[in-house]
Amino acid sequence: MNPVIRPATEAELPTVGALIALSFDHLEQNHSLVPDPAARLRVMGDFFTLLTEHAPLCGKVEVIDGPAGDLVAAAVWFDRTHEMPEIPHYDDRLAALAGEWLPNFHALDELFDKHHPVDPHWHLAFLAVHPDHQHGGLGGALMDNTHQDLGGTPAYLEATNDDNIRLYRRYGYSDMIPFDIHMPDDTPFYRMWRS
């Protein structure tokens, strides 16, 4: 059975941010950004919400509901076929949510800005599936849904680990050069492109 994919409502965007934080909580990248496990889910949820709230203006946020009606999967895409508008009050909002870890988030932004492709594309910023619903094809369904809509427009993403890389390769993404890029503490991300 194919899952029903729908646009997230504006009211759901904080829930999407929290879902991304929960599904990414095991990743070394999140641990690098917020080393304190007691604060990580809150800070990362706020960070993902900050970015997710901007996506409907210049991209899209799609979700899948679980059997109980809660969100179990989400994809956050940005349309980079034209110049993307800045997030209003981004610096102030980032400083407020990141607190003592603000330098880590600045390093992340600098890394991603430096290595982001210039060719027109759609950027898969986040693909998240609730831990209780992973390995059921929901992430792939979300990717397929947008890939079909792109009409041959390329797509880009930053993968976080070997499992992600294998998944994205199955959906037509290839390694870019440079492939791995690193935070100052050597935490890696992996650049991938789908033509």
Regions found by a protein language model. Give the residues of each.
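A short helix-loop-beta-strand connector motif used in the catalytic cores of GNAT acetyltransferases and
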Residues: 45-63, 117-123
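Conserved beta-hairpin
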Residues: 57-75, 128
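Conserved N-terminal entry element of GNAT/NAT acetyltransferase domains
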Residues: 1-14, 22
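Conserved acyl-donor/pantetheine-binding loop and adjacent beta-alpha core of acyl/acetyltransferases
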Residues: 74-130, 134, 183-186
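Conserved acetyl-CoA-binding loop-helix of GNAT-fold acetyltransferases
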Residues: 129, 135-148, 170
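Conserved GNAT-fold acetyl-CoA-binding loop/helix
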Residues: 27-49
